[in-house]
Regions:
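Short cytosolic juxtamembrane segments of multi-pass membrane proteins
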Residues: 1, 364-379, 785-791
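Membrane transport/envelope proteins' first extracytoplasmic loop
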Residues: 1-256, 265-268, 290, 501, ...
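Interfacial "coupling" helices/loops that link adjacent transmembrane helices in transporter permeases
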Residues: 6, 10-13, 255-299, 374-377, ...
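Alpha-helical transmembrane segments, especially those used as permease/efflux helices
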Residues: 9-20, 30, 239-242, 255, ...
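Membrane interfacial helix motifs at helix-loop boundaries and amphipathic/re-entrant anchors
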Residues: 34-48, 61-63, 223-253, 308-343, ...
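Small-residue-rich transmembrane alpha-helices
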Residues: 263, 296-326, 339-364, 399-403, ...
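Juxtamembrane segments of multi-pass membrane proteins
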Residues: 420, 425-426, 432-576, 581-594
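C-terminal transmembrane helical bundles of large multi-pass transporters
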Residues: 467, 628-631, 645-784, 790-791
Length: 791
């Protein structure tokens, strides 16, 4: 009961803790609801088949999602026939896909929307108008494109633009041609759909299909058919999951920090109160229980508000994630009752964990503290804290030196270790640093005419605990924001420079609104192109990115091109599969056939693909392959007709745009982390300043009695807050600077290229300005209330 009473009485002191717990629980609730939702859906064009058989899964690595290896052509046909003979099965339809795109539309990389007409039977939609295609120049298209039967349509294919006549329209997406024409354009078979007789039990047929398939595939029925959702959507969900997990963990961690700092400052300001309780008989254990009770009360109320807020805002967060590209279109969040309950419990636990140090400090208060009158912090830092701070700073200095000589693998870890160690060290040493540092930096104020300047200086030096409690969160956030944003920008710029320097070409021809360049577009370019495909190494299960190249490949990359039955692989691939120069590598290609190719060269892992094949080999086995880029090696610009959907840009521009989508997602992820940390910092700063200002009624009264006007009082308090925030920002920059300069030096040594440091000034300015704004508001607003109450 005493804990509840003190929590109500000192609500301003615990306001920051309440907000931090509420926001943390809200973020955890929203993140968990999205992560646990079944975002995948059965593709519409396959949803009409109750039973689907998928080819065996390949070897997947974290963050890389590729299609399953296709069956060998003969195996696919034999399996289709066996499945078609099962009781209750009307037909077994192989699904094939190839690149097809109407002119003036857009598709993302990797999409293949063309299919044989027989596969239309697997869709849950059908013809809306017209008839199926009969001849090679007929096609059925999505009616949303606006075409009607009989109209001509230009469709982009891997060969180039082709003219078709629309024979019919569908109620769903896709381009459907005759089976014979599709066989020439498509690769291998990865899915076989089973069409059942009316009234047939799909579960029974699926069981029979599993016996027939054995280990040669996976039988899917019902909700399990969601496994056939596009791999691009699966990758998007995976990226979104990483983002949500990181934000939730960061929120929980920073909530502990805010709760800890809030209660630590509150306990430091209540030493006389605790000393008085000890004087009247309270034991150290009772004081510890009192502080824990206050944390439990504040944490429970904050967690309840946060859980409710998280449930309400989860759909809104889902929409934001979809717009940002962290969840696929059509993703829907589902509510699970136990998620907010678990988040509530987590919030309470986090509050109790955060208050541990403060409760121990309260239990060590002596009864004589009740007699303490002075507000001067005579011993702001313990010996243990000083030793820990010096040790962390020393570790940071060692890591900083190491970044200048580290390789690419250790560079990021050492840079992160430098910043984290220096930030931790300076934060621990803050109570001992702020006095001398502020004394030195504000010495001119001591000679400034007028009392306000002297008061600002002396208040900061005297109230070391209050000053360091405000400096610490600003220091940590500025260091984190500067390190993360600047490191991301610097490494992205360095990677762009590396890619551009590795290519010897005059210009790059890139696709415009299409997944890649067709053969017709590549034929216009005098130079080398990279015909993108996927091959499967070893036992035919390990997916490898591959490119088909021509003889001009050597002029661009200074690597002899593969010819005939040869292949070039990167060092990592060679090591993983035990391939050496001169050995034969067995590769399964896009049509399911296996080729044995002799390794003629092992190249550096910095190459854009893992495997390089002769261009005609890729085209023979992957009729729908598209080139990601074609490099022009001649001085004259390439004439590109509009119908080819291609543009010519500089090599540097292509290097910057090659991973533009990935860089965009990484940058959004980075800014989200910075925003979360900055938000909690603002809470910590505002809470500390609000608590401190509410407890400085005597200071305000003395200033007024000394002749200061209300305006002078407010300006004095605001100036003090601004100086403290500025000091925190300066220390944060000092903590991040060694890591950043070490990273730049390491990148220069690693790449052999000039690398410049890129600072994200807008975000740095925004973080500092936000802390200043909230800190000043938390100082001035309660001070104005106090001034109104004074006579």
């Amino acid at each position: 009961m005493i804990s509840l009473a003190t929590a109500r009485e000192r609500w301003t002191s615990f306001l920051g803790c309440f907000v931090a717990v509420a926001l943390g629980v809200a973020v955890v609730t929203m993140s968990a609801l999205v992560l646990l939702s079944d975002g995948a859906k059965v593709p519409e064009r396959l949803a009409g088949a109750p039973v689907l058989v998928q080819s065996p899964a390949g070897t997947q690595t974290g963050g890389v999602f590729t299609e399953n290896p296709p069956w060998a052509p003969q195996s696919a046909e034999e399996l289709r026939r066996e499945l078609a003979r099962l009781p209750g099965v009307v037909d077994a339809v192989p699904d094939r896909s190839f690149y097809a795109q109407a002119a003036d539309t857009e598709q993302r990389r990797g999409e293949r929307q063309g299919h044989p007409w027989s596969a239309a039977a697997l869709a849950e939609y059908g013809l809306s108008e017209g008839r199926p295609p009969v001849t090679a120049d007929e096609i059925v298209v999505d009616r949303s494109l606006g075409f009607t039967p009989g109209e001509p349509v230009t469709v982009l294919t891997a060969r180039g633009p082709q003219r078709f006549s629309v024979s019919g329209t569908m109620n769903g997406p896709g381009y459907y041609v005759t089976d014979r024409w599709a066989a020439e354009l498509a690769g291998g078979v990865r899915t076989i759909g089973l069409l059942l007789e009316s009234g047939t039990d799909a579960t029974r047929v699926a069981a029979a299909a599993r016996r027939a398939v054995g280990g040669d595939g996976t039988v899917l029925t019902g909700a399990s058919r969601e496994a056939l959702a596009p791999k691009q959507d699966e990758m998007t969900r995976w990226i979104g999951g990483q983002v949500l997990t990181a934000i939730a963990l960061l929120s929980a961690f920073v909530t502990v920090f805010v709760v800890s700092s809030t209660f630590a400052f509150a306990v430091a300001g209540r030493r006389r109160e605790f000393g008085l309780l000890r004087t009247i008989g309270a034991t150290p254990r009772q004081l510890k229980r009192l502080v824990y009770g206050e944390a439990l009360a504040v944490g429970a109320v904050g967690a309840a508000a946060g859980a409710l807020l998280g449930v309400v805002l989860a759909p809104t967060m889902t929409g934001v994630l979809i717009d940002a590209g962290f969840q696929p279109a059509g993703f829907e969040v589902s509510l699970r009752w136990w998620v907010p309950v678990a988040a509530f419990a987590t919030g309470v636990v986090v509050a109790l964990v955060g208050v541990g140090a403060a409760s121990r400090r309260a239990s060590r208060v002596k009864p004589l503290e009740a007699m303490r009158e002075a507000a001067v912090d005579n011993r702001p830092m313990t010996r243990r804290r000083r030793v820990a701070g010096l040790a962390a700073t020393g570790v940071g200095a060692v890591c900083s030196v190491g970044t200048a000589f580290a390789g690419a693998d250790a560079l990021v870890l050492l840079a992160l270790g430098t910043a984290m160690s220096l930030t931790t060290g300076l934060t621990l040493l803050a109570p001992g640093l702020v006095g001398p540092v502020i004394g030195a930096l504000t010495r001119p104020l001591a000679r400034h005419p007028g009392a306000p300047a002297v008061l600002v200086r002396e208040n900061m030096i005297t109230a070391v605990r209050r000053t360091s409690a405000t400096v610490a969160p600003v220091l940590a956030t500025v260091a984190f924001a500067v390190l993360i944003t600047s490191t991301v920008q610097t490494t992205q710029n360095a990677d762009t420079a590396r890619q551009a320097a590795a290519v010897r070409a005059e210009a790059a021809v890139v696709p415009r609104g299409t997944p890649g360049l067709s053969d017709a577009a590549v034929a216009r370019v005098e130079g080398a192109s990279l015909l993108s495909t996927t091959v499967y190494g070893g036992d035919g299960r390990a997916a490898l990115s591959a490119a088909g190249v021509s003889s001009a490949f050597e002029r661009v990359y200074a690597v002899p091109p593969p010819q005939g039955d040869t292949v070039v692989v990167t060092a990592a691939v060679a090591a993983a599969h035990g391939w050496r120069k001169g050995q034969v590598a067995s590769l399964t290609l896009e049509d399911g056939r296996t080729r044995r190719l002799r390794v003629t060269a092992v190249v550096d892992d910095s190459m854009p693909y893992q495997v390089f094949l002769p261009r005609d080999v890729v085209r023979d086995h992957d009729p729908s392959a598209l080139a990601d880029v074609a490099y022009r090696t001649t001085p004259a610009p390439t004439p590109l007709p509009a119908g080819l959907s291609a543009d010519e840009i500089s090599v540097e521009a292509y290097a910057a745009s090659d991973d533009a989508e990935e860089d965009r997602l990484v940058w959004i992820f980075t800014l989200l982390l910075v925003a979360v940390s900055a938000g909690y910092t603002a809470i910590a700063v505002a809470s500390t300043v609000l608590t401190a200002t509410a407890g400085r009624v005597r200071d305000v009264r003395v200033l007024r009695l000394s002749g200061a006007t209300p305006r002078q009082v407010l300006l004095t308090l605001a100036a003090e807050t601004c100086c403290v925030v500025a000091l925190g920002a300066a220390l944060g920059l000092a903590a991040a600077a060694p890591a950043l300069f070490g990273t730049v030096h390491g990148l220069r040594e690693e790449l052999g290229l000039p690398v410049e440091l890129s600072l994200a000034w807008p975000w740095l300015t925004g973080v500092v300005a936000g802390c200043l704004l909230l800190g000043t508001a938390a100082t001035v607003l309660p001070a104005r209330v106090v001034l109104r109450r004074l006579p």
